[in-house]
Amino acid sequence: MSRIQVDTDYELTKGIEMLFKKTVAPILVLRLLSKQKCYITEIPKKVEEMTDGAVKLCLPYTICTRLRSNGLIAVDAELKDGRKRQIYKITEKGLDFLRQQSASYINCVNSVAAVFREE
């Protein structure tokens, strides 16, 4: 019986990278919206700029829908160039959540970084 050889290093690396981005993307969107209101089309570019290209959001609608359904962000209607557009903003609940998660995230990242500095 022949076996298909799988590059597990590649799969593991991609899996970790995808999981990291999936976990950190909502926090980055909240961080962005804590600084400024944004149209949905602006969010991916601004997050990419914030992270020096390390995080690229493919599905900002999915992230924003989840954040909105949890009351962490809200949408205002705005008239721009004669068209009604939706602009996203963070809520008070979102700010509280961001503060809590930011502290937790920084602590976790620093702890993991310390493990790698031990070498």
Model-derived segments and spans:
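Beta-hairpin "wing" of winged helix-turn-helix
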Residues: N70-K84, K89
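Amphipathic alpha-helical dimerization/coiled-coil segments
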Residues: D96-E119
